[in-house]
Amino acid sequence: MKMLKKLLIVTSLSLSLFGFNSQTNAATTTHLVQSGETFWKIANKYGVSVNNLKKINNKSSDLLFAGEELVIPNTTISEADKELMARLVSAEAKGEPYAGKVAVATVILNRVDSASFPNTVKGVIYQKVSGYYAFTPVQNGAINQPADELSKKAVEEALAFRGQGKGSLYFYNPKTATSNWILSRDVTVTIGNHKFAK
């Protein structure tokens, strides 16, 4: 019986140490702050949000010092995800102001973060609801066209400021929208020809 207790204690201790170790290894990338760098520039470089970068480094202000080492949180947004987002932004927000492009990219990220939608960029963009794709450019093939540089920049900005918007999960053009359901959503902001809603 004593042997069983010792084995149980050793096993529990080993598991707790292993669990702690895997938790601390979750964010192992670091960045040495250079003169003139900001949270936004660093977050943009690594494809993480400013909020997450500040949170993991216990920072509440925007103050950074050259030579300071920051821990970079892991991100689930790959380069392929960014490219896919940029192509969707380019197709959905063609002719819209830059702020509208950022807002479209933010809707994608908000959906990824919402329990009501798929939890990946690809899953959100290619989601089908009642037999229809959620985004028209997926349905009509415009998603396959290359993204313009402004749309790529808009995606980077949306990633850097992830979680700081108004929580929009939808957007639509009221002149072309045919769904009464979308028109019933609470509008958070209007940018260009698009209304963004929850």
Could you describe each region identified by the protein language model?
Residues 79-198:
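Bacterial extracytoplasmic/cell-wall-associated proteins, especially those involved in peptidoglycan
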Residues 55-59:
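Short alpha-helix capping/helix-loop boundary micro-motifs
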Residues 39, 53-54:
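Conserved hydrophobic/aromatic packing and binding residues within compact polymer-binding modules
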Residues 2, 40-43, 113, 193:
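Core subunits and conserved enzymes of cellular information-processing
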Residues 21-47:
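Primarily a LysM-type cell-wall glycan-binding module
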Residues 1-26:
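Sec-dependent N-terminal signal peptides of Gram-positive bacterial secreted proteins and lipoproteins
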Residues 15-17, 26-30, 69-83:
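Intrinsically disordered, low-complexity Ser/Thr-rich linker and spacer segments
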